[in-house]
Amino acid sequence: MENFRIAKFLMQERQGIMIMKFYGRETERKKLNSMFCTDGQMISLIYGRRRIGKSELIRQVLKETELKSIYYECKQTTEQNNVDSLSELVGETFDFPKPAFADMESLLRFLFRTSEKEPLILVLDEYPYLRENVKGLDSVLQSVIDEYRDRSNMKLIICGSYVDTMKELLAKQNPLYGRIDLTLNLKPMDYYESALFYPDFSDEDKVRIYSVFGGIPYYNRLIDGKKSVRENIIDLIASPGARLENEVSMYLSSEISKITNANEVFEALAKGFSRYKDILDQSHVSSGPALVDVLDKLIRMDVVDKITPINDENNRKKSGYFISDNLSLFYYKYIFRNSSRMNIMDSDIFYDRYIAEDFETKYVPKVFEDVCRQYLIRRNRKGLMDEIFEKIGKYYYDDPVAKKNGEFDIVTQDDKGIFSMKQNSAKNL
């Protein structure tokens, strides 16, 4: 019998209640399907920032397999409440009355024991919620995994959005260390996968949309193909009460305790300050160590990147920090500092006055550099470059005669040590 929740999802889809086409993630899907086809017990860890599409990926691969599966979304409630909820799914999956279990350990042992007879996929989505409410859950899992390792056919997927918490499961001191067979850290999609969500736009407009909404599937599903780029931006983020108006601040608040420092850092980065000293001066963060903590956290959250020049990778003075999440970049560049104005102005007038010109002449061309980099990486992976490169990045140079310095936006280096200059020349799209 198919898992009840997955079967219900498929039935709704056929009836037109829920039709969501799945895009991209080919590599991740192949790895998970390969795991399902592997004999014996397999444990997988899937993590990544919220809205990145973890649950959607899992649901998709569950639809693609014939194995019996249980998908459970852990709750922020007591252990017994979670046990009761998961027990209901167990009864539905195996077509018998809801079983009674004293605790999560006894339930897990039952499922692992059952998988001795036939393969079973168990998904524990939002695992950190369960971990908070089941004392020593990592140790419990470790004990069950070890006990049944040589005789179960369990395919366990542990999934979560709190990146730091999920990474703890991979640490040497964690009971689950060495027991994870497959780790998937889901990153934002690149331009080429993201553009699949809005196929009816021109290539130029696809770049414009990507420059705002980036590679987060949840955001891209909100794009209305019947509206213009401008209308989508206004409706989704650049107007009072817009669907994504508070998305960035809510995400940061859920991950960072001192949101004021994060706001200060983001504002400095959005203004173009990328060097550590400049960010410290502009952001008014209380101290150097405090700034380091904020930057490190933002990097772990996949919203900021630290970039060093390809020709001087160990020179800390030439390292730069940049906002890598497009929605965060757009928000802090145009919305955050102007939110009071936006709330009392006509949305079209606000867009024309504070967004339109800079967006076309500076913002989009800058993001286009990243699209070009992604293009080169894709061609390189497919072996289509004349010279297969091993590194790609920025190239900084000093001109002692002219007494100035500069940079090439995109540079590649092959195994011969030859640099290939790929400088972006787009000014307007």
Regions found by a protein language model. Give the residues of each.
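Conserved NTP-binding/hydrolysis module of P-loop NTPases
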Residues: 66-70, 75-98
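Conserved lysine of the Walker
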Residues: 54
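Interdomain motor-coupling "hinge/lid" segment immediately C-terminal to the ATP-binding subdomain
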Residues: 166-262, 266-270
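Active-site beta-strand-loop-beta-strand hairpin of nuclease catalytic cores
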Residues: 412-421
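Accessory nucleic acid-recognition modules appended to NTPase machines
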Residues: 225, 230-410
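Sensor-1/coupling segment of RecA-like P-loop NTPase cores
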Residues: 47, 129-133, 137, 143-173
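Short glycine-rich substrate-engagement loop in P-loop NTPases that contacts/grips substrate
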Residues: 87-115
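Hydrophobic positions on the alpha1 helix immediately C-terminal to the Walker A/P-loop
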Residues: 57
